[in-house]
């Protein structure tokens, strides 16, 4: 209740953040509609090969996030942040409007790369602006909570909105909704007075990554990114196998399982500001790593079940635990980025986090999918548990060499 009151006050009093948050929500809803529409478009063009098309599109997305983001950040270093954000939104909107007219798989790949390259420009730039807009540490923590809630709610709400719209329109029209989300986002940014951007004098694409590799504080965060990637890959890639193959459930049962993961994440995000009044972000995030490892370990046991009420309860509980653990890491991670950067280095640091965190998925997605397909879900969960455990222990060791962050009391 207290967290909700703080959030309401911040949204009411901080006009700039309110507009930027609205822009984020609009863009996220557009992205959610795009996910549904893209799946239907892939099936319309490729039929039974739609899964391969979407898998390739996901790989293209990760490549854009990992490799394009640092390059674009360096190229746009001297430009006003508003111009960068609005241009990225315009490119995304125009690309979304083009997708309904494609009739070849390769055209999907090209447009997805353009769209995801624009997203790889928008997201870290947006995240790097927020610390300047919300300078107070406590308020910034609440802003991160709101941002995390927006991501989790989008994953739950967007499919429902898409399903409702598809009862009255064709899936091609969903791309118009996607474009509209990006247009609203651009309009909100245009109408917002952003702090003046202080550009770094010499900015190279690898500057942020070099900084990550030099500092124990950021190296620890990099290790925790791997914990998140391991837990998230288990849920994202293999939920459908647990639900449909192991338990014999339906598509609605899959939504049920993913809903528990999202609910766990949202509950954890809501409590982060309160917890950080009594402990520091290192302890909170390392605890989150332990929770995530416990969740992946529990998944090995769940994979041996074959359905029935107890199996569904075990799955719901495990997925909730995974959501809680990943959110305990994700939600406060930007606090470390803010602490380890200044006005001139913030863009490169946030971009490096964006790039490196997604690079971890290039490892965990194949592990979850290929190991699960070849050796079974028990082995896949066990391998991901081992990977997450090693990453969590590495983070703890790295952070033991740094000074504990100061606890910010209420």
Where are these regions (language model features)?
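A single, central transmembrane helix in multi-pass transporters
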Residues: 25, 29-37, 168-176, 210-271, ...
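Juxtamembrane intracellular "pre-TM" segments in multi-pass secondary transporters
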Residues: 2-18, 194-224
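MFS 12-TM fold signature
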Residues: 61, 91-96, 181-185, 291-299, ...
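Helix-loop junctions on the cytosolic side of multi-pass membrane transporters
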Residues: 128, 132-133, 175-203, 396-408
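Extracellular/periplasmic helix-loop-helix junction of adjacent transmembrane segments
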Residues: 37-64
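C-terminal transmembrane bundle of multi-pass solute transporters/carriers
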Residues: 66-78, 82-84, 244-410
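Transmembrane alpha-helix termini and helix-breaking/packing motifs in multi-pass membrane transporters
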Residues: 39-46, 98-101, 157-177, 245-246, ...
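Substrate-agnostic recognition of the 12-TM MFS/MFS-like secondary transporter fold
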Residues: 19-35, 60-76, 80-92, 107, ...
């Amino acid at each position: 209740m207290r967290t909700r009151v703080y959030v309401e006050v911040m949204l009411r009093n901080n006009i700039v953040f309110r507009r930027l948050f609205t822009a984020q929500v609009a863009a996220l809803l557009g992205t959610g509609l795009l996910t549904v529409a893209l799946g239907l478009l892939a099936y319309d063009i490729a039929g039974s090969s739609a899964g391969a098309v979407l898998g390739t599109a996901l790989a293209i997305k990760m490549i854009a996030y990992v490799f394009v983001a640092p390059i674009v950040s360096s190229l746009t270093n001297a430009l006003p942040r508003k111009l960068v954000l609005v241009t990225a939104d315009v490119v995304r909107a125009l690309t979304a409007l083009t997708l309904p007219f494609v009739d070849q798989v390769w055209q999907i790949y090209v447009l997805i790369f353009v769209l995801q390259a624009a997203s790889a420009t928008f997201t870290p730039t947006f995240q790097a602006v927020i610390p300047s807009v919300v300078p107070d540490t406590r308020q910034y923590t609440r802003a991160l909570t709101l941002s995390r809630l927006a991501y989790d709610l989008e994953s739950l709400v967007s499919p429902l909105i898409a399903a409702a719209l598809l009862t009255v329109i064709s899936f091609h029209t969903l791309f118009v909704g996607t474009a509209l989300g990006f247009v609203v986002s651009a309009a909100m940014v245009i109408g917002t007075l952003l702090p003046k951007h202080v550009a770094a004098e010499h900015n190279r694409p690898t500057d942020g990554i070099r900084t990550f590799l030099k500092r124990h504080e950021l190296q620890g965060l990099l290790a925790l990114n791997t914990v998140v990637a391991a837990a998230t890959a288990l849920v994202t890639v293999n939920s459908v196998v647990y639900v449909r193959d192991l338990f014999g459930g339906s598509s609605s049962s899959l939504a049920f399982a993913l809903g528990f993961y999202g609910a766990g994440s949202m509950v954890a995000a809501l409590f982060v500001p309160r917890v950080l009044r009594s402990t520091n972000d290192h302890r909170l995030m390392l605890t989150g790593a332990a929770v995530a490892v416990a969740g992946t370990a529990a998944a090995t046991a769940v994979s041996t079940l074959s359905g029935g009420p107890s199996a569904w309860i075990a799955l719901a509980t495990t997925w909730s635990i995974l959501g809680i653990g990943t959110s305990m890491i994700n939600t406060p991670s930007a606090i470390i980025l803010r602490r380890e950067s200044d006005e001139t280095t913030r863009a490169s640091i946030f971009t490096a986090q964006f790039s490196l965190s997604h690079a971890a998925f290039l490892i965990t997605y194949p592990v979850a999918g290929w190991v699960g397909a070849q050796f079974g879900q028990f082995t896949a969960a066990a391998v991901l548990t081992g990977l997450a455990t090693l990453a969590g222990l590495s983070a703890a060791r790295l952070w033991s060499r740094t000074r504990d962050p100061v606890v910010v009391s209420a």
